[in-house]
Regions:
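Class I SAM-dependent methyltransferase "Motif I" SAM/SAH-binding loop
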Residues: 53-55
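A short acidic, Gly/Pro-enriched loop at the edge of an enzyme's catalytic core
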Residues: 115-122
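Conserved class I S-adenosyl-L-methionine
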Residues: 1-45
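A short glycine-rich, Lys/Arg-flanked "PGG" loop and its adjoining helix->strand segment in the class I
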Residues: 139-151
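C-terminal lobe and adjacent flexible extensions of AdoMet/dcAdoMet transferase-like proteins
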Residues: 215, 219-247
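A conserved beta-strand element that flanks and buttresses the S-adenosyl-L-methionine
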Residues: 124-126
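SAM-dependent methyltransferase
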Residues: 156-215
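Class I SAM-dependent methyltransferase SAM/SAH-binding core
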Residues: 57-113
Length: 247
């Protein structure tokens, strides 16, 4: 029997499948909005938020709807195209056409290596996207983020703390399943989305929240909040949101 062809999850049709599953996932969103509301200095009110690995806008759109101005970046042109379509669709359905588009600038950028002359009141790296990066790339992402923050600005990063080992498969919907293959010794995690006869893969790294905390400390950022939420679908998984402030 022939093995199924594994296509990338974040490009082509995979990007559309990912968006279809993630669009209604509100994990982290309330915490991120609460963090911005409670921890941002009023002195930074005129500055924008930089979002890394924004994908199809799962976090971008709620931040914009809350009144924030955002530079939304991602390395996947396909994901950014989905985001642009969503912005246009939501704008056309409101009484204030163009309102979201005025608050969101969409730009292609690599989260592990970027440089903007603009300084931001917050840099947001949600959806455990940091797990797509190896150790060197992760350090690059955090260093670039720290440089991009205005004094007093916030770095908001999410990851997964995982104690499980081996392979787990969960059914998301009839005909749609997610398989996770974990290798704790190598620090690797492979996610395979099966959508009918289609298969999409994402090769990830295990990035414990302690690693991010230590890296932030070395960059002279102060951890001000840590939220851990057990994953109800995956055993021995917890989603962690870390918030660090630049002096």
């Amino acid at each position: 029997m022939r093995s199924p062809v594994l296509s990338p999850l974040y490009s082509g049709l995979g990007a559309q499948r990912y968006h279809a599953l993630s669009a209604h996932d509100d994990t982290e969103i309330a915490l991120i909005l609460e963090t911005l509301e409670n921890h941002l200095s009023p002195d930074l009110a005129d500055l924008r938020i930089l979002e890394l690995a924004c994908g199809s806008g799962r976090v971008t759109l709620p931040m914009a709807e809350a009144g924030y101005r955002i530079l939304a970046t991602d390395l996947s042109p396909d994901m950014l195209e989905v985001l642009r379509s969503r912005i246009a669709e939501q704008d056309s359905a409101t009484d204030a056409p163009g309102d979201l588009a005025a608050r969101i600038e969409v730009q292609e950028a690599d989260m592990s290596s970027f440089s903007f002359t603009e300084r931001f009141k917050a840099v947001c790296l949600p959806t455990a996207s940091i797990t797509q990066l190896d150790a060197e790339q992760r350090l690059g992402a955090l260093e670039c983020s720290a440089r991009s923050l205005a004094p007093g600005g916030l770095l908001i990063v999410s990851t997964d703390d995982i104690a499980a080992e081996g392979t787990t498969t969960i059914e998301i919907q009839p005909g749609i399943s997610l398989t996770e293959e974990l290798d704790q010794a190598r620090g690797r995690r492979r996610s395979i989305l099966r959508w009918g006869e289609e298969c999409y893969v994402s090769e990830l790294h295990l990035v414990p929240s302690s690693w991010i905390s230590e890296a932030c400390t070395r960059l002279r950022l102060t951890i001000v909040e840590r939220h851990s939420t057990p994953d109800q679908a995956m055993p021995d998984h917890s989603g962690v949101l870390l918030v660090a402030r630049k002096p």
